[in-house]
Amino acid sequence: MSNVSKKKLSLPTVQQPAARWAFVLAVCASLGVVVSYYWRVFYGLDARGVSAAGVTGLCVGLAVLAGAAALALRRVRDFAKKGAACILLCGVLFAFANPPMQTPDETDHYLRTYAISMGRFDFDAQRGYPEDVDELVAAFPGAWVNAHTSAGLGTDPDTHAEQPFNSAGYVLKQYGKDGRVESIRDSFEQYLTWLYRDSVPQRVTEPVSFLILPFLPGALGMALARLFGLGALGCLYGGRLVNLLAYTALCYAALRSAHKCRPAFLCIMLMPMSLYMGASLSYDATLLGCYYLMLALLTRDEWNDKTALFYALACVFANGTKPYINLLWVVLPLILRKSEWKVRFSRAVYAVLTAAGALALTLGVEQYGTLLRHNYGAIARQGGTTVNGGAQLLFVLKNPLRYIAVLLGTLYENDGFLGQLGLFGWKDMPIAFISITAPPVLLAAAMLCTAQTDTLGRRRMGWLGAFGLVYAVGAMTAMYITYTPVGMVRIVGLQTRYFLPVWLLLVLAAAAVLRRVLAPRLTAAKGEALAVTLCGWYAFAGAVLLFQHYFVGPVYTIYK
């Protein structure tokens, strides 16, 4: 072969990476233009005075960065590192797409985290915060959508007939066809202009929250933000980002520890609801990470001292963060066979030691919160005087069949909670697309775990399934006893985030069934590669939709 022909053959291989990058980035930029045009036309951004260049630049820039990240991750061969990178990058989008205080209970979590970042490790109900914190809390009430919902009777401009209106579930609303659009942007303007206003916000004091340990990552982020001269809003985002780092680190440890069904773990970690909590100031960020780590360790064929130590630490931390219900995790290592147990202690001794550590931390946290609490007085029970844990427990024991009906009715009313994976905010901001597509994505993840090398065995899978059922019923019963009025026919306060580890176990069970029904030829490596693509882009789409619903549209039009 001549030298000329050799050069011709070598040119495509040299130019291929550059050509791929150019092509992918061009496609991403084009998609960004399409999305920006869709937003401008369908949601009337031009008529609302939003800069067309700004919207287009935002969409194109975000799309190009997403494409560049996807191309860069193609070079990463390690599944755990690639998955952790997806979690971190998509989590950053969620941290900024989610407005302040809109994660459940984030106002209390923000105030407690801010206090810790100032070096306050005790609790004082009369102690306040800097003025910009007061302004931030005043501008962004929790459950913002519910707080700004309008309902009543209006007049149809075409038929002149009265028609009811209710803006529940809509962040943006407009009075009249050409009226001004009210949105959460108004809250940002209210906070950012507080120095130029004469009004004084209501003074904020420390909340009824007596935890320290799970808020330490967020407190570190807030302390770093203040070092850079940022105010209350900057501290919120700084705390979210460091909390996200903690969630990412735990997920990375889980992906490295999991020996089987890794696509299922990546899928649940990248679920929009998981990232929504992981990129917030909620202690659920580290709590979910601990759940995923413990379940990942249970996919290993054998346990050694190191495995047992990591599981015990995660279990003890989970109990210190959310006590009593998480004691169920203590018994899970007992499902391992004796031949699979290579730990210096027996399984029974290990379970007792882990339970002792969990209870010790739980009681220590409770005593710490009691002894270092000042000026709180008598703390009212959530739910009011109609809530009585002892009476409710007695009612359940006396009426077991009725309580089963309460469980089933609550599940039915809430779409089994599996259909609420797109319900954000304080359960006041639904995104229908995510609610509809999340279950099929979980099913797709189950199909990606059907390689024969991913099987967990009937015994282990059976016990994990039983644990998932007991955990779900236990979580519902705990909310019924502690938050629900005695004898009520439905359970108050349940949210789909409580069931995320149950959905992971459901995916593992579905994979076991599909493995037998479909007789697939998919390899574990191929399944993992497909999982990164599917779940990564789904998480990216979830962040974009969250931003869209809070800042772009849909817009609810009210005619009066």
Q: Where are these predicted regions, by residue range?
A:
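Transmembrane-helix signature of polytopic, membrane-embedded enzymes
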Residues: R20-W21, K81, L230-L233, Y252-P272
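Interfacial juxtamembrane loops and adjacent helix segments
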Residues: R120-L236
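Membrane-interface alpha helices of multi-pass inner-membrane proteins
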Residues: Y276, T307-P323, L328-L334
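Membrane-lumen/periplasm interface segments of multi-pass, membrane-embedded glycan/lipid transferases
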Residues: L363-A451
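Perimembrane helix-loop-helix junctions
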Residues: L297-W303, N326-G357
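Transmembrane-helix motifs of polytopic, lipid-linked glycan transferases
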Residues: G67, Y237-C261
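Short acidic/glycine- and proline-prone juxtamembrane loop motifs at membrane-interface regions
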Residues: S280-L287
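Transmembrane helical bundles and short interhelical boundary loops of multi-pass, membrane-embedded
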Residues: V34-G57, G357-L363, Y368-I379, T523-K560
